[in-house]
């Protein structure tokens, strides 16, 4: 926010940036929308494990529009491979079964914001190993979870 109270429309890039990490994403349109978000916020996008689509699939490209050339994209075998490549990135895990809200997370530039696959989320063993780093987005009523692209947007903009 500027001194006169008007919202700042353009943010300066963070160094180090927040990293968007998707573990085995299944729906190409979600990944395409998240890629556009990554481009808009200059946040690297990391895809881990087996994808439910080919990254060159038309639906992925279409959802990301013409912003793919602006996305820093890395693919990793798994979370261990990601951690090996980015040892200083603190993992912040997001899950529909979390007990704490994302609003309680202490975000720091350089954090890796980790989201699981659309159908089942993150591996329960990973969540159990890192209980202090697991957060969720509260929902009311019978809705179990939010769309992955929406969840990533909510968390990333809160972190920024």
Language model: regions and residue ranges:
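Post-transcriptional modification and biogenesis factors for structured RNAs
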Residues: 1-160
